[in-house]
Amino acid sequence: MYGYTLFELKSFNLKNGIHHIPLELPWSSPGFVNVYLIEDKDGFIMVDCGVNGDSYYSLLLEYLQKLEINISDINLLIGTHMHSDHIGLSTKIRESGVPFALFKNSVDFIDDYNDWSLRFKNLKDYAEKHNAPTSFLNDIASINTPSYAGKISKPDILLDEGEIKDVKRNLTTIFTPGHDRTEISLFDESTKIIFSGDHILPKITPFIPTDNENEDMLANYTQSLDKIYEIDHEIIAPGHGDIISKPHSRIEQMKLHHKRRTEKILSFLQNSDFTGWEMVENLFPRKLDALNLRLAFQETMAHLIYLENKGKIKQETKNNSIYW
């Protein structure tokens, strides 16, 4: 089933009792999620766990065996955010007696995680409001909850910002919403490593989900970047890809990416008004598959809302359509 033998992929050389597992995913990009094991007390804290499925659970156990770690050695599983590639296996691991932790606001999104028709309903309504074509709306309406997401229930532990209780290491939760409303990063004081989930990635910028106009997700994201920037850290261990050895430089790059995108939108709007969907087509002229088109729409709307809240642009209704 798998395209790689165990540990054929490079595992990070992290220090002070931190182990890394590149766990395969059922899609090609990104092809792996980074699972981390942090030594603590008489066992380990696991950060993220991959997608649901017996084969993926077996693969995780093989990796653990290679590290001479048993599932019973895991004292705590922490999910950085509520995406299936990070917490899909959580219920299976909980069945082994491992307590599961998410940020405290996760309880508000459990139903959406378990039923993707609920999760995408707001997006469909929002896309229709901003002149998305019928084919796009039909694609959203056809989405079903995939088996690789698994089902989750209320976590055993609801994390708040600050030092995590009942662990030996000085491990701190940092609330970093933007890519996901529940996203957290973890700071290990002894190594000055930040485990960033999908908040900060080495090669790409995570997409910013947007399905309503009441939340400025891009503002949340940039504020979360600033929060990490101010912490005295040396390395970022991301949810995908290689370690980030120059974290402050990477954060500056990511902020510049969003600045340039907002500038591009403003340049389009200098000479003409556009609907939300027309702006998607301007920013992403190449033909995209269904998934990437959904991401492009949300990313575009996130930037439009951000600019509107900055007072740079505004919406107005003409001929029963919303224009920017």
Name each region found by the language model:
Residues 44, 51-53, 144-149, 170-262:
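Metallo-beta-lactamase
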Residues 15-23, 142-148, 167-169:
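Short Pro/Gly-enriched beta-strand edge/turn motifs at strand-loop
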Residues 8-69, 185-197:
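Conserved beta-strand hairpin/beta-sheet module of binuclear metal-dependent hydrolase folds
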Residues 17, 38, 48, 81, ...:
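Divalent metal-coordination and catalytic microenvironments
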Residues 7-13, 35-43, 58-65, 72-77, ...:
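A structural signal for the main folded, soluble domain(s) of proteins
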Residues 1-5, 264-324:
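C-terminal regulatory/interaction regions
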Residues 28-30, 159, 177-180:
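A short catalytic or substrate-binding loop motif that flags glycine-/basic-rich loops and adjacent residues
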